Design a protein with these regions (language model features):
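Generic structural signal for secondary-structure transition and capping sites
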Residues: 8, 27-31, 64, 68-75, ...
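Amphipathic alpha-helical packing segments from all-alpha helical-bundle domains
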Residues: 52-70
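C-terminal helix/juxtamembrane-tail motif
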Residues: 129-137
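GST superfamily/GST-like fold recognition
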Residues: 29, 33-38, 76-104, 109-115, ...
Length: 137
């Protein structure tokens, strides 16, 4: 938010309220809940049936909510790519770990693929591991 505000990029004044709403959704729901799904389903499968089931269902609900939003909006906060998309996209970049089927969510898939082709996203994705490639559908 600070850098967006100072740079005047990806955090425009006109859409700031909606951008903030989606940032808070990412920080309060998308990140923590999908992170828990990663913990139980990907990193520690079989250790807690309750945890695996709970966070699978929550992650599936998040997919549906994001898909519904992206049905009426090109990006999360409106017609333009913003810091809300930047904060949320990395969680979807691990969609193969979720076993939900990103391709079953047309609007979320469109958004994911469009962002995955951005030069800065490609560069950032492989920053720590030059061999990393962004998963497709």
């Amino acid at each position: 938010m600070y850098l967006g505000d100072k740079s005047g990029k990806l955090y425009n004044e006109k859409d700031r309220l909606v951008i903030n709403q989606w940032l808070m959704a990412q920080m309060g729901t998308v990140g923590p809940m999908i992170g828990q799904h990663h913990q139980f389903h990907h990193y520690n499968p079989g250790k807690s049936e309750f945890g695996e089931e709970r966070y699978f269902k929550i992650t599936k609900r998040i997919y549906g909510e994001l898909d519904a939003r992206l049905k009426i909006s090109k990006f999360l906060a409106g017609p333009d790519y913003t810091i809300a998309d930047i904060a949320t996209w990395p969680w979807m970049a691990r969609h193969e770990w979720h076993d939900i089927g990103l391709k079953n969510y047309n609007n979320l898939s469109r958004w994911y693929l469009e962002i995955s082709e951005r030069e800065a996203v490609v560069k950032g994705y492989s920053f720590m591991d030059k061999e990393s490639i962004i998963p497709k559908l």
